[in-house]
Amino acid sequence: MRLEKDTLGEKYLTDETVYGINTQRAVENFPLSHKKVNLHLIHAMLLVKKAAAKTYENLVEDIEKEKYQAIVAACDELLLKTEEDKSFSQQAEHNRDNQNQAEDNRRGIDALFVTQALQGGAGTSTNMNVNEGIANIA
């Protein structure tokens, strides 16, 4: 277990949990639906965050480049997972083995991106879910 803190207090999260305290609060505060945010949106957000990190990497001193390279690598890892999910889902219609792969991969993705499609705010919870996933992988 790990303890995370924010301005609202503290929460324990399991060591396997990739997201952080803000995402956990969103899960608890917005149990309005059981439909998760569409992976196409998360994929697009990851592309934007990767592009921003690559841009900043070119603007900072060498000592800071390692941080941005870690962010880009984390984005690449998560982008691959979202691409695999989309690919397996399309193939699953034609092949039972691919259905099993799609289900296994989706369970992995569901453990990373847990925010509900219906939530308060302007997507802040989803943005934090993606940010925390990138940060904890980087």
What is each residue range found by the language model?
Residues 1-138:
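Conserved, well-structured ligand/cofactor-binding cores
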